[in-house]
Regions:
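C-terminal motif of bacterial Sec signal peptides marking the signal peptidase cleavage site
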Residues: 24-26
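Acidic, low-complexity, intrinsically disordered peripheral segments
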Residues: 28-51, 317, 331-376, 380-388, ...
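Regulatory alphaC helix of protein kinase catalytic domains
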Residues: 57-103
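A glycine-/polar-enriched beta->alpha junction
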Residues: 97-102, 113-120, 124-139, 154, ...
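Amphipathic alpha-helical coiled-coil segments
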Residues: 115-116, 120-133, 258, 262-287, ...
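Transmembrane beta-barrel strands of outer-membrane/channel proteins
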Residues: 141-149, 189-195, 433-441
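Extracellular loop and loop/strand-boundary signature of outer-membrane beta-barrel proteins
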Residues: 159-163, 199-203, 303, 312-314, ...
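Hydrophobic, small-residue-rich alpha-helical packing segments that form membrane-like cores
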Residues: 209, 213-226, 232-350, 357, ...
Length: 620
């Protein structure tokens, strides 16, 4: 009978090992029998293969390549690309996998740049995302198979069941389902099958099966109890490291707010680059006109000098002015690598610089909107800045800024998170008191199943289990009490300090936003007044130039130095007029930036679920 039992357990062991081998084939591997240090050809082959793979990587996508940039000695482009601001924004949104910015941050700190994938990356974080927090409440299945062969000498006859030379075949097959509940409860359902065949003289059967089915419930009454605590800290959260569903969703919403901030800054930079290029063209036009006029005056004075009708210094002054404007034309056409107008330089939305030049500003705009860096065409803005006066009511826009600014939405969620953490951390000031209840059914038999009526009281374990003859239960409590609660008190104090910090930051952010909004509104008023002043200045300068040119046409004596100076004043007045126009339109943009409506101002809308995510904290 012992041999039959041993054959049975061997069959069970064989099936168990086969099942494990089929279930986890990926966990097996083969080890080379050759000494690794005898021949390095294996490693050389790996290196050659690696080098080959690197050398045959895919070619860059066409969007990542570009022709040579337009140089100063290149001919004028044969084709212009007339572009409106709305078209530039649409192109930027179409090609905005990475929310680019000027200044090289993409190369220096690529991990700090936002991409369109960031919200989904945060949402699917396997450690801190909402799904990771919800997974704490998923049912966990666990099982294993253990087969033993025991052969030992025993000192005590009773310990060996009537023998002092124990020979035993033992198999244990446990299975468990564990589930955590939102109240802090944990439920366990266990199934365990034991097989024991040994040579003990006191055995009823030479081999026997035990079948056990058990249910257990563990319910915390103090620390760890309650739906609110478990939604904040989660079933496995530690003091100071909450991992609950509520915290995970707040973290996701904070990340979503950061993405919206990055998108707003990106659109602001696209608009900044567009108006930079617009001004560069107007600056170039004014200087081209002045250069051509200076060339004409120089040529006329050179002719008069040859006939000795003017002195040589007049011709030299005209020549110097021509070359001065020629140098400015060259600089304005090609541009210089100075800091562009971008978010955060001077003002939050960007203070207009207007120092780049056409080619540099055009390449910057191409970079931002994600198109080819050079395609033989030259982008030309065709949208004119508005000259209409824009009026804002301070009471309305200040309230709107405090409601709509995404930075404040983000910080309010941080305050909400700290409030929840403080509330839940007080739970750790209680001792751990768990109620434990357990109920168990047992089955015993010579065979596992299908023993039939062989004349024994326990033919098989399954049938005996179904009769319910053997039932057990246990009820008790488990108590843990750390003396003094030193760590818990430190955790509560830390949560209080963190909450105080976030509230102070929120208060100062509100003050800063109102300060910046006031600055932007005042700057918009200043820019509009300067537009009117520079317009009048340009009219006066043009009238002065027209009067001098009229004297020249009618053959009256002309002060050539005054004529040259008049052209300089007209050119500077023209440039300053267009500069003030661009400053005004950008000041209007910056007011929208400060009051949180820039994306609406540029007709950019997020999906409904994106906005509803930020609004969901009211339900927490």
């Amino acid at each position: 009978m012992v041999e039959d039992g041993r054959n049975a357990v061997r069959r069970w062991a064989g099936w168990a090992i086969l099942a494990l081998a089929v279930a986890v084939p990926a966990c097996s591997w083969t080890r080379s029998q050759e000494p690794l240090w005898d021949d390095v050809a294996h490693y050389r082959q790996i290196l050659q293969q690696t080098a080959y793979e690197d050398a045959t990587c895919a070619a860059p996508e066409p969007t990542a390549t570009a022709g040579p940039p337009i140089m100063i000695d290149d001919a004028a482009p044969q084709q212009y690309w007339d572009l409106t601001l709305q078209e530039a924004v649409e192109l930027a949104l179409t090609n905005s996998t990475v929310l680019r910015e000027l200044g090289g941050a993409l190369i220096r700190s690529p991990d700090l740049l936002e991409t369109i994938h960031q919200p989904a990356i945060r949402e699917t974080d396997p450690n801190l995302g909402p799904e990771a927090a919800l997974s704490e409440f998923d049912a966990i299945y666990s099982s294993n198979v253990l087969v033993e062969k025991n052969d030992r000498a025993l000192n005590n006859l009773f310990t060996g069941g009537g023998t002092q030379l124990l020979e035993q075949d033992l198999a244990v097959i446990p299975f468990q389902i564990e589930k955590a509940a939102a109240t802090g409860s944990r439920f366990y359902l266990r199934n365990r099958i034991d097989y024991d065949a040994n040579n003990g003289a006191g055995n009823r059967f030479p081999h026997a099966w035990n079948w056990l089915v058990e249910a257990e419930v563990r319910q915390p009454l103090l620390q760890g109890a309650g739906v609110e605590f478990n939604r904040i800290y989660g079933p496995s959260g530690r003091l100071g490291a909450p991992r609950g569903v509520t915290i995970a969703r707040l973290n996701t919403e904070v990340g979503l707010a950061e993405f919206q901030i990055a998108m707003r800054d990106y659109i602001s930079n696209v608009e900044n680059a567009y108006w930079e290029l617009y001004f560069a063209y107007r600056d170039l036009d004014a200087k081209l006109t002045a250069r051509d006029a200076s060339l004409e005056i120089w040529q006329r004075l050179r002719t008069l000098q040859e006939s000795q009708r003017v002195r040589g210094e007049n011709e030299a002054r005209a020549r110097e002015q021509y070359y001065r404007f020629q140098a400015e034309v060259q600089n304005t056409l090609v541009g210089r690598l100075w800091e562009p107008t971008r978010t955060g330089n001077g003002t939050t939305g960007g203070t207009f610089r207007g120092v780049q030049g056409v080619h540099v500003a055009e390449r910057n705009l191409r970079l931002l909107i994600g198109i080819s860096l050079a395609d033989g065409r030259l982008i030309r803005p065709i949208e004119e800045p508005s000259t209409a006066e824009v009026l804002f009511q301070w009471e309305e826009i200040s309230t709107e800024a405090l409601v709509r600014r995404t930075e404040l939405e983000r910080q309010r969620r941080m305050v909400k998170r700290r409030e929840l953490e403080l509330l839940a951390s007080k739970n750790f000031l209680q001792p751990r008191l768990d109620v434990i209840s357990r109920y168990r059914w047992r089955g015993f038999g010579e065979d596992l199943m299908g023993g039939g009526d062989n004349g024994t009281p326990y033919p098989d374990a399954w049938a005996n289990l179904m009769t319910g003859d053997f039932q057990e239960w246990a009820l008790g409590m488990e108590f843990t009490f750390p003396n003094g609660f030193r760590q818990a008190h430190a955790g509560v104090q830390n949560a209080l300090l963190r909450l105080a910090r976030e509230r102070a930051v929120l208060e100062q952010q509100e003050r800063q936003i109102l300060h910046d909004l006031g600055n932007s509104l005042a700057d918009m008023k200043r820019a509009y007044a300067i537009v009117q002043t520079n317009y009048n200045r340009r009219v006066a300068a043009q009238q002065d130039l027209d009067a001098l040119q009229e004297r020249e046409r009618t053959g009256q004596e002309v002060d050539w130095d005054q004529l040259l100076e008049s052209w300089r004043r007209v050119t500077d007045a023209e440039i300053q007029l267009h500069r003030s126009l661009v400053e005004y339109v950008m000041a209007v943009k910056n007011v929208h930036f400060e009051k949180g409506s820039l994306l609406d101002y540029n007709q950019v809308q997020f999906a409904d679920d994106c906005r509803s995510g930020l609004a969901s904290s009211a339900a927490l």
